Amino acid sequence: MASQLTDAFARKFYYLRLSITDVCNFRCTYCLPDGYKPSGVTNKGFLTVDEIRRVTRAFARLGTEKVRLTGGEPSLRRDFTDIIAAVRENDAIRQIAVTTNGYRLERDVASWRDAGLTGINVSVDSLDARQFHAITGQDKFNQVMAGIDAAFEAGFEKVKVNTVLMRDVNHHQLDTFLNWIQHRPIQLRFIELMETGEGSELFRKHHISGQVLRDELLRRGWIHQLRQRSDGPAQVFCHPDYAGEIGLIMPYEKDFCATCNRLRVSSIGKLHLCLFGEGGVNLRDLLEDDTQQQALEARISAALREKKQTHFLHQNNTGITQNLSYIGG
């Protein structure tokens, strides 16, 4: 195995977020309010199963332990189960997760688990069906809820649910969410609304700091848990009276980037060192056959030396991220 991926600030990288499509069938107000519009896809299209196999093998050899498949909506790919199986071939990768809108969860989650999936994140921004419809543009609340139940039935011991925190939309619904997870092993993750190139007006109107919820959770006796090295950026809280947990992802908090442990590869094969970084490093020309493995690993390692210490969201610099479907949020 090659040496562990480490940047100039001594941060070690165990976690790859791999986008496999930027297509999504939902029209979430904070991401794709006008629906999906094709952009950035080369004549080659999205990464193939073989290309995904090669890029994840390279990251595994460089110390990656966790791969999250993202989009867009990853389950819209007809070969999604094959993609899971291809990533699963790497023994060094201990966790394979997906972030999904839940559209196909009820139908397909059992086959995903059989292929090797170990974790699921489902996006649910409201527990009110009408508000869910208003946020996502899809009247699929009951279908998504049935999908979460199906995930438990398929054998997943815990399901993570992502909720984008928005002022005057859902920030005041904490009690409703807490009641939902009291007897369910769900880790409910409130994610601060992040500014993107296309979402500046929405951000100014609806952003609220996750610290408001953190202060309330601590007041109610919730306990902050320690992070594991391959965990994502969430601050996780537990309570003895609840089967579920609460996670808070607060990218505007001081030192948020100090514990960064993840890199991103887009659906067209570009390595992105930060969700809100500039440009990207092309890897696709080194994904054509297995003989390029060593060169691929060398390019990834060399690129990491250019990773910045922090994002520049506080300066209203959102980099190339026009919307969160582009490189998978």
Swiss-Prot record:
Binding note for cofactor: Binds 2 [4Fe-4S] clusters. Binds 1 [4Fe-4S] cluster coordinated with 3 cysteines and an exchangeable S-adenosyl-L-methionine and 1 [4Fe-4S] cluster coordinated with 3 cysteines and the GTP-derived substrate.
Catalytic activity: GTP + AH2 + S-adenosyl-L-methionine = (8S)-3',8-cyclo-7,8-dihydroguanosine 5'-triphosphate + 5'-deoxyadenosine + L-methionine + A + H(+)
Domain Radical SAM core: from-to ranges: 8-234
Recorded GO MF terms: 4 iron, 4 sulfur cluster binding; cyclic pyranopterin monophosphate synthase activity; GTP 3',8'-cyclase activity; GTP binding; metal ion binding; S-adenosyl-L-methionine binding
UniProt: [4Fe-4S] cluster 2 binding residues: 257, 260, 274
Amino-acid positions noted as binding S-adenosyl-L-methionine in the UniProt annotation, renumbered to this chain: 30, 72, 123, 194
Gene Ontology terms describing biological process: Mo-molybdopterin cofactor biosynthetic process; response to heat
UniProt: GTP binding residues: 17, 68, 99, 160, 262-264
Chain residues that bind [4Fe-4S] cluster 1: 24, 28, 31
Top enzyme class: lyase
Keywords: 4Fe-4S, GTP-binding, Iron, Iron-sulfur, Lyase, Metal-binding, Molybdenum cofactor biosynthesis, Nucleotide-binding, S-adenosyl-L-methionine
Cofactor or coenzyme needed: [4Fe-4S] cluster
Subunit structure: Monomer and homodimer.
Function: Catalyzes, together with MoaC, the conversion of 5'-GTP to cyclic pyranopterin monophosphate (cPMP or molybdopterin precursor Z). Catalyzes the cyclization of GTP to (8S)-3',8-cyclo-7,8-dihydroguanosine 5'-triphosphate.
Family recorded in the similarity comment: Belongs to the radical SAM superfamily. MoaA family.
Entry protein name: GTP 3',8-cyclase
Species assigned in the record: Escherichia coli (strain K12)
